[in-house]
C-alpha cells in the first residue's frame, strides 16, 4: 500500500479496519507492523505528514505551562511519521528491576507487571531500535577494561551498567518501506484524532472521530483502538473523549492527567580521579557488533532500598561548550558549529539550544557563561592539530556516516577531571498534572494546561546520591567528587524541568480505582481501547523512555493477536 495523505481532504469519509492505531511514532509503528504481521487488518492514523509540516506541528502547542519548568511542546515533540524518534539522540536504556518494586518510600509505585515479564521483550526491542544485543552490562564487552578507572570495582556503587545507542533510528524513515508495502496495513497522514466514542455504558468504543486542517471529517470503525500519540497527546485524546459513565474516557478513577513525571538531570559536581589519566574510560566503547555503548554510575537495588534512594544514574560528561575557559579547541569548534546557520543540521533544536547556553527546561545543560567569539577562536588556534584531527574523525563518524553514527563525543582531560552528569527518577506526585484548557486549537480540540511539579524529595535524592558516589570513590582510593556549588539543593532545583520524557498521566494499575489502564494497557472499563505510551508507566526510573515504550508496544501487539485472533 502507499501513504494516503488526507491533509487536503475537505469531504467527510469513513474507514473500517480491525485495528486502528492512532499515532505513527515508535509505539504506533511497532504496534501496527507487529499486528499486521499477525494478519490483522490495521489502519495507522498520523496527524502529521511523512515530513515535517509546521502547521501540523503547531497542533502540539499547550495553552499554559511554566517556562522555567517545562519545555515548549513544539520543541519537545514531533508531529510526523516517526514521531519524536525523528529528533532523538538514540540512547537505549531499559528500566531496572527496582523500578518495578513497590517501594514504601515512593508514593503509589506498584506496577501490575514485573521486570521479568518485560525483560522477555528486550531482545526484540533492541532489534526494532537497531541497538544491538540486549546486553546492558560491561562484562560482555570484548577486551574492555573491567572498570571506568583502575581499582573502581563494583560494590554498592556500580560502573558496569551500560547504555546502548541506536543508529539513531528514525522510525519514520527506517520503517517507511514496510509501512507502505504491507498489504493489510494502511497509513493515513494529515488527519488528527479528536475523540473516541464509547456509546452509553457498553464498555467498548464504537468509533474514532478525526479531522483534517482542510475541514474534512473522518470516522474510523474498528474492533480495537490503540492510542499511541505520545505521553501528553495520548492523555489529551482520552480527556477529550467521553467515557461510558460520563466524564472523560479513562477518568473515572481520578488519575487521568495526574502523576506527570519527567526526570531530574544536570551537573553539580566534577569527578577528580587520582588514577592514571590515560586509563580512564571516558568515551563511548564498541561492543562485539560495533554498536556504541557507554558505562554509567549506578547503585545496586539493595543499596537503593536500604537508603531509600530514588533511582539515578550518572556518567562522565564534557564541560559546558559556551564557556571558553575549558580551553579546549575541540569543544570550542563544536560550539561555534552549533551556533552557526548550519547548527540545526548538526543537532535537534533541544540539544543544540541546550549545548549553546540556552536555559531550556528538561535538559542537563543551559544557562552557562557564554564567552566571546574571540576566546573560542583562540582555543582553536592554540590547538590546531588536535582540533583538525577531531573534526576529520568525528565528522566522518557522525556527519558522513551512512548507517550507524557516532552518538556524540567526549574529550579527554589530562588532569583526569570531568563533569558528572546525572539522570534521575522524578518521584510520582499526584499534584503534578495536566488538564484540558478552555483554549482550543485550529481543529477545535481543547489544549492542555501543564502543571509539572517537583518536590524537595526529588532534590534531596539527587544530592544524597552524589554523597554516596563521593564516598565510594574515596573509599576505593580512586578519587572524589568536587562540588561546583555551595548550595547543592538550590543547584539541583534550578535545573529541574521536563517535557521530553512524558511519564505517568495514564498510569497502569491492577485495580481500576488505582489507575487509567490495566496490565494489558486497556483502559479500565473499556476493553477495546489501549494506550501505548510512556504515559502508562507508573514510575519514571533513571532511564529515558523510548526503549521501554518499544518493549511495551511489542507486548501489546502480542496481546492484540490473542484478542483479535481468538
Regions found by a protein language model. Give the residues of each.
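Residue-level detector of alpha-helix initiation sites
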Residues: 25-26, 232, 536
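Redox-cofactor-proximal catalytic regions of oxidoreductases
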Residues: 62-138, 421-437, 442
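N-terminal Rossmann-like FAD-binding beta1-loop-alpha1 element of flavoenzymes
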Residues: 17-44
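A glycine-rich dinucleotide-binding beta-alpha-beta segment and adjacent secondary-structure elements
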Residues: 188-201, 396-435, 443-539, 546
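Conserved redox-cofactor binding core of oxidoreductases
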Residues: 73, 104-107, 111-200, 204-205, ...
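Extreme N-terminal leader/targeting segments of oxidoreductases
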Residues: 1-19, 37-38, 562-566
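FAD cofactor-binding and catalytic pocket of flavoenzymes
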Residues: 64, 253-256, 265, 269-446, ...
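Glycine-rich loop(s) and the adjacent beta-strand/alpha-helix scaffold that form part
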Residues: 37, 50, 71-74, 196, ...
Amino acid at each position: 500500500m502507499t501513504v494516503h495523505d488526507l491533509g487536503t481532504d475537505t469531504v467527510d469519509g469513513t474507514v473500517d479496519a480491525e485495528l486502528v492505531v492512532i499515532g505513527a511514532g515508535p509505539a504506533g509503528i511497532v504496534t501496527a507492523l507487529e499486528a499486521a504481521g499477525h494478519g490483522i487488518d490495521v489502519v495507522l492514523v498520523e496527524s502529521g505528514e511523512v515530513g515535517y509540516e509546521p502547521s501540523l506541528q503547531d497542533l502540539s502547542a499547550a495553552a499554559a505551562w511554566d517556562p522555567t519548568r517545562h519545555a515548549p511542546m513544539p520543541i519537545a515533540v514531533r508531529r510526523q511519521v516517526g514521531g519524536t524518534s525523528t529528533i532523538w539522540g538514540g540512547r537505549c536504556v531499559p528500566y531496572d528491576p527496582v523500578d518495578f518494586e513497590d517501594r514504601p518510600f515512593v508514593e503509589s509505585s506498584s506496577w501490575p507487571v514485573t521486570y521479568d515479564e518485560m525483560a522477555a521483550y528486550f531482545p526484540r526491542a533492541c532489534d526494532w531500535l537497531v541497538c544491538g544485543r540486549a546486553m546492558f552490562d560491561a562484562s560482555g564487552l570484548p577486551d574492555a577494561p573491567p572498570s571506568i578507572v583502575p581499582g573502581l570495582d563494583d560494590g554498592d556503587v556500580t560502573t558496569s551498567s551500560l547504555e546502548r545507542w541506536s543508529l539513531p533510528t528514525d522510525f519514520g524513515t527506517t520503517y517507511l518501506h514496510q509501512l507502505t508495502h504491507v498489504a493489510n496495513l494502511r497509513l493515513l497522514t494529515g488527519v488528527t484524532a479528536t475523540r473516541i466514542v464509547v456509546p452509553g455504558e457498553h464498555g467498548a468504543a464504537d468509533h474514532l472521530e478525526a479531522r483534517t486542517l482542510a475541514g474534512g471529517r473522518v470516522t474510523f470503525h474498528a474492533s480495537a483502538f490503540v492510542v499511541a500519540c505520545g505521553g501528553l497527546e495520548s492523555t489529551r485524546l482520552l480527556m477529550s473523549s467521553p467515557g461510558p459513565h460520563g466524564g472523560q474516557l479513562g477518568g473515572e478513577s481520578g488519575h487521568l492527567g495526574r502523576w506527570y513525571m519527567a526526570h531530574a538531570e544536570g551537573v553539580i559536581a566534577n569527578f577528580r580521579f587520582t588514577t592514571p589519566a590515560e586509563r580512564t574510560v571516558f568515551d563511548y566503547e564498541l561492543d562485539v557488533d560495533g554498536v556504541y555503548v557507554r558505562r554509567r554510575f549506578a547503585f545496586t537495588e539493595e543499596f537503593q532500598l536500604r537508603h531509600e534512594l530514588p533511582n539515578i544514574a550518572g556518567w562522565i560528561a564534557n564541560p559546558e561548550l559556551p564557556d571558553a575557559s575549558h580551553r579546549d579547541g575541540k569543544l570550542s569548534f563544536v560550539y561555534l558549529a552549533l551556533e552557526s546557520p548550519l547548527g540545526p543540521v548538526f543537532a535537534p533544536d533541544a540539544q543544540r539550544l541546550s549545548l549553546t547556553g540556552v536555559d531550556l527546561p528538561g535538559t542537563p545543560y543551559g544557562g552557562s557563561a557564554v564567552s566571546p567569539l574571540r576566546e573560542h577562536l583562540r582555543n582553536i588556534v592554540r590547538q590546531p592539530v588536535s582540533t583538525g584531527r577531531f573534526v576529520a574523525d568525528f565528522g566522518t563518524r557522525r556527519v558522513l556516516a551512512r548507517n550507524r553514527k557516532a552518538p556524540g563525543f567526549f574529550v579527554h582531560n589530562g588532569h583526569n577531571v570531568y563533569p558528572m552528569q546525572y539522570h534521575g527518577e522524578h518521584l510520582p506526585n499526584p499534584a503534578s498534572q495536566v488538564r484540558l484548557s478552555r483554549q482550543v486549537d485550529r481543529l477545535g480540540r481543547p489544549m492542555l494546561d501543564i502543571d509539572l511539579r517537583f518536590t524537595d524529595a526529588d532534590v534531596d535524592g539527587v544530592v544524597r546520591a552524589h554523597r554516596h558516589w563521593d564516598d565510594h570513590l574515596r573509599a576505593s582510593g580512586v578519587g572524589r567528587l568536587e562540588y561546583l556549588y555551595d548550595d547543592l539543593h538550590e543547584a539541583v532545583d534550578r535545573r529541574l524541568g521536563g517535557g521530553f520524557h512524558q511519564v505517568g498521566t495514564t498510569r497502569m494499575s491492577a485495580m481500576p480505582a488505582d489507575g487509567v489502564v490495566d496490565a494489558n494497557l486497556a483502559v479500565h472499563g473499556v476493553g477495546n481501547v489501549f494506550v501505548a505510551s510512556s504515559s502508562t508507566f507508573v514510575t519514571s526510573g533513571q532511564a529515558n523512555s523510548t526503549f521501554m515504550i518499544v518493549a511495551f508496544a511489542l507486548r501489546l501487539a502480542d496481546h492484540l493477536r490473542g484478542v483479535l485472533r481468538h
